[in-house]
Amino acid sequence: MICSRYDGCIPSLSLLLIAAMLSTPASRNPLHTREITFQGYAREDGLWDIEAHLRDFKFHPFTTGGKTWEPGQAFHDMWVRITVNTELVILAIEVSMDSHPHPECPQVIPPMDGLIGARLGKGWRKTINEHLGGIKGCTHLRELLSNIATAAFQSIPGALFDPDDNKPPLYLGTCKSWDFDGPVVMRVYPKFYKWKPTI
């Protein structure tokens, strides 16, 4: 049971169900939509492709970069595809800017090749910033790249597991549910319940 001065006492499960739904919003008008999708693919050659797609559009006409964009017309429509091996090393990268507000935007595509040979995992965001940070890259492509690693982890079997059975999966200790001292780890990975890294 969880109790509050507003709701009285309710079962914990009920609180979880309540937290999963947003309340009915106030009367409002839509202004902007950003759609981001990630998809993982197993290739026949034993490698994996992870694709990311970002699309921005507004619900009213607006002008930027000397061009007027109509409602629903994407002014950002960008794709990134990386090919990785089992060790999550990037073997190839491809970028497409199907829509962009300024003619200079595609100039950031060639430097993306600098990520070939990098590994998804610890330090990935630092690697992105080293190669594509600031004026060397694109804010929106960096956003896709930052999260493409998560899609890879979800897509590739064993990506989050250390081959050493005496070490916990890499996602343990990264969020509330996977707290080493919490009930989920105690149930699912009792071996690593209360685990502390050795220094």
Question: Where do the model's predicted regions map?
Answer:
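N-terminal amphipathic/basic-hydrophobic helices that include classical n-h-c signal peptides
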Residues: 1-20
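Intrinsically disordered, low-complexity segments enriched in small/polar residues
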Residues: 3-6, 38, 171, 180
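Short N-terminal helix-initiation segments at or just after the protein's N-terminus
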Residues: 18-32, 156-163
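N-terminal intrinsically disordered, cationic/polar leader segments
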Residues: 24-49, 53-64, 77
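Active-site- and interface-proximal helix/loop "cap" or "latch" segments in soluble metabolic
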Residues: 54-199
